[in-house]
Amino acid sequence: MSDCIYNIRKRSDMTSATQNKKYKVEAYTDTVKYYYEYLVELSKNKYKSILPYIQYILINAIKYRVGEEIPENISPTIKKDYQNRIINIIKQIDDDVIINTNKVVLDTKLYLLKLKYDELPKDDLEFKDGFAYFKNKKIDKIINKNSFSITNMSLKREKLWINGLIKMSSYFEFNHLYVDEVGKTYKINLLETDKNRKSFLNDDMNIIKSFSGFITLDRKKTRLMFYTKYNELDIIFKPNINIDKHNKMKKRCGILKNKIYSVKNNRTLLIEHFLLLRFVIKYLREVQMYFKKN
């Protein structure tokens, strides 16, 4: 049921296309009334409750709506009524349905639970072993492949400069990136960005922060581990190298100026900084060209 599929009417012309619906008043009035609320009442009248299958249909539709800002052409009255109706439906959805619906990231699940309970009950929320739990039920991984990305790296006089982004649920408060390098820990400040994902209530569903800093490399070969802290919890990131979008080997190994980097165990970044021999450079370039052509 968490992967439910349902049919949608064939659209008669481009004026009713999906990409235009967010600017139409009907999307915030008729759709909610004659689709979402209709299903709720139909199920209650026939079965005295909202069937799990109906709940999955509703949550699969609503999950997109809570993560979209309402356009300015919608009047404040309609906007407020729409928000209240959506929240009222969410309050009738079972926790298990919100938690177990597939293809919904942790940010959205936590936000849906927050809307249901007005505020997330901290006593019921737990983080351990890299997962988030609500009332002892596993929700999802705390981080995913898009949570941490390195957008630029450069080596200057034994200093490795690193730039990147951290993307996490707005539930977490995090202000620093920590980099562990054999016996040393570096603390890099995180900066606010204007890339946060806004909800239909115009608050933040997730927070994206940028970082820029350097670490001093005293060895020819070292390992780096990246993490941030939330209260007493260490949130360890899996390096996502995003230097060259055309390089299909970027997640496993690559070449940047005068160093080799590679990801080991999905958690640590192995740095070898030395001048490469000409044949090694030539070989790696040939491999890169092969992947680009194919």
Set out the residue ranges of the language-model regions.
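Short amphipathic alpha-helical segments and their helix-coil junctions
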Residues: 33-49
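Nucleotide-sugar-dependent glycosyltransferase catalytic core
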Residues: 2-34, 68-79
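Non-catalytic N-terminal targeting/anchoring module and adjacent flexible stem/linker
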Residues: 45-294
